Amino acid sequence: MRLKISLLKEPKHQELVSCVGWTTAEELYSCSDDHQIVKWNLLTSETSLIVKLPDDIYPIDLHWFPKSLGIKKQTQAESFVLTSSDGKFHLISKLGRVEKSVEAHCGAVLAGRWNYEGTALVTVGEDGQVKIWSKTGMLRSTLAQQGIPVYSVAWGPDSEKVLYTAGKQLIIKPLQPNAKVLQWKAHDGIILKVDWNSVNDLILSAGEDCKYKVWDSYGRVLYGSQPHEHPITSVAWAPDGELFAVGSFHTLRLCDKTGWSYALEKPNTGSIFNIAWSIDGTQIAGACGNGHVVFAHVVEQRWEWKNFQVTLTKRRTMQVRNVLNDAVDLLEFRDRVIKASLNHAHLVVSTSLQCYVFSTKNWNTPLIFDLKEGTVSLILQAERHFLLVDGGGIYLHSYEGRFISSPKFPGMRTDILNAQTVSLSNDTIAIKDKADEKIIFLFEASTGKPLGDGKLLSHKNEISEVALDQKGLTNDRKIAFIDKNRDLYITSVKRFGKEEQIIKLGTMVHTLAWCDTCNILCGLQDTRFTVWYYPNAVYVDRDILPKTLYERDASEYSKNPHIVSFVGNQVTVRRADGSLVHISISPYPAILHEYVSSSKWEDAVRLCRFVKEQSLWACLAAMAVANRDMVTAEIAYAAVGEIDKVRYINAMKDLPSRESKMAHILMFSGNIQEAETILLQAGLVYQAIQININLYNWERALELAVKYKTHVDTVLAYRQKFLETFGKQETNKRYLQYAEGLQIDWEKIKAKIEMEITKERDRSSSGQSSKNTGLKP
């Protein structure tokens, strides 16, 4: 990826350009110390003077009023705030009319920024004050006051906090009066510029120490650059938070969100005092010290999938290369390419007006449909369909171009959704809520309606990343997510009545990805690269989960690596320095998944015997129990040395009825409640009481015996035997109450138990067992 620079031979301004701002993706306004505001039209390459300001007004900062989201096409911003050296800020219309001038600070007003909703304006000045203003320019509050100038300011993603500079310090101050203020030393020189992205919640800072840095919202440094030759005078995030630009003397740099540099350009611009990204994130404009306005387009973005490599060579041209035979195809587009995604044998490209869908089998005939709004901010793909996110909503389309659904939820803000907070599978869409980050919304892909009974997935901590598995049946669909403590959890997306368990899979997990061909999960866990060959094992046999893992040292990937993709058995990891590392994992677990999904149990056992890996046997054991194939489970558990479980499975074979076997399989997986329910529904009250006795669940055993008026003496007898074994006295009031005057006769109890078992066996053999449990013999 690099920047394609365009610079006029002669500058349009006579003095330094202090600030620039985009109205649409093709129109820019620039302000200069020559008191002129100039409009640039990039389609016609024309410039026109909008207004000449009075000679005593030297503009310093410009920010357009935020456009209303969700309106068809790109609504143009109609007014902007201009801060100036005379201590005022000016509200100016698009046509150049000064609507209002407000005395704001003593000395120059160094920066002014609208919040994301356009309901408030923050200004900072040489007098060290941070002030909040209403939309119409009425003072609401003075947020902060200090003895040194505040050079730059930025709103937090929720518009509830403000970030500003204080010499070498950065300060995050909430608007609530008594809330905690976060302050830290960020640079060794005065901080000149800051920016805070609403999508990734990361902070940029630039200082006179010639460095730029990336921070999280807690003030932890994620990246610090090497010192440059000159002070860094400007930084700016791309709207989607994936890239940022850095400006210095004769220097323009394009960087990834993690800090490493994609491209360095050395245009003849003087210092770049201000950088603005276009609304679609494809180009930047810089305000230059020598009167120029520099424009740069982001080109040579690259997408890879299996043997295909797609490169954006020009704004409207892509090159597709098949690395197997070196065949090259050129794709021409009518409009500028904004976003693209290559996955699941399809390339999806959005331009400013249309969406193109190419199949990797045929690059010549794309499917084309018009977009509701021009600026697509996110494309996600699944095997059967893909998701587009723009300012107006979320839209699901098939690869034939057919519109499928558009999920909606209260307070939806599409401008802050990214690949970490939205996940797509063949039947489900998962979206993390921004208002309450502990909640995940789950939707049916086919209808866009909430999944199941409409219950939300709620967690005890804030969630940072979500991912749906890609294969298998809808009822078995799982979602994995990482919370703010870096713990990895897994749960079922099926939300009918009973609350599904959320189970922890790992700790200190930084990034995760599901395989696209089978339900294998991988993640970078502290200093380890971990692959969960069968994550579903947590619901079947939690004890065997550690044996189903593959782990290797990940210290070679340095700090903060990120998993880019997991295709087949190939995992691609992006290191902190920007380099890509490919990791190959064993292909056998994927083959095992395929055999099991086709119920080819003999082939699965044969594969495990051939490979002779404990992790594969452990996976097969858990898969067999999940699919109620206890013959295969017995073989697999024996292979991993779990003799106690082999004996338990053997004991199940002697159980008199299918219901009892089913109940004991559920108990084997830890589902005690379901096991008891199955027995009670089948009328096997004694068996239900006995499993509670075996688990020392005395309260429940007595409760069932009393409720069904049977085997009270059996429960009391086993309780007495238990107390005698441990040399204890009875203290439970209910047991004391029922034991009064009851003579325990073990002969009678054993005869009654034998009768129950005989009755159950007879009923089973005569075919009266009404419920088919789907149990494999």
Swiss-Prot record:
Subcellular location: Cytoplasm; Cytoplasm, Cytoskeleton, Cilium basal body; Cytoplasm, Cytoskeleton, Cilium axoneme
WD repeat start and end residues: 12-50, 104-143, 145-185, 186-225, 227-265, 267-306, 504-542
Entries under InterPro entries matching the protein: Beta-prop_IFT80_2nd, TPR_IFT80_172_dom, WD40/YVTN_repeat-like_dom_sf, WD40_repeat_dom_sf, WD40_rpt
Keyword match Zinc: no
Single GO cellular component term: centrosome
Coiled-coil ranges from the UniProt annotation: none
Gene Ontology BP, a term: odontogenesis
Keyword annotations from UniProtKB, A to Z: Cell projection, Cilium, Cytoplasm, Cytoskeleton, Repeat, WD repeat
Subunit relationships: Component of the IFT complex B, at least composed of IFT20, IFT22, IFT25, IFT27, IFT46, IFT52, TRAF3IP1/IFT54, IFT57, IFT74, IFT80, IFT81, and IFT88. Interacts with IFT88. Interacts with IFT57 and IFT70B.
Function, in words: Component of the intraflagellar transport (IFT) complex B, which is essential for the development and maintenance of motile and sensory cilia.
Name of the protein in its database record: Intraflagellar transport protein 80 homolog
Record lineage: Eukaryota, Metazoa, Chordata, Craniata, Vertebrata
Gene this chain is encoded by: Ift80
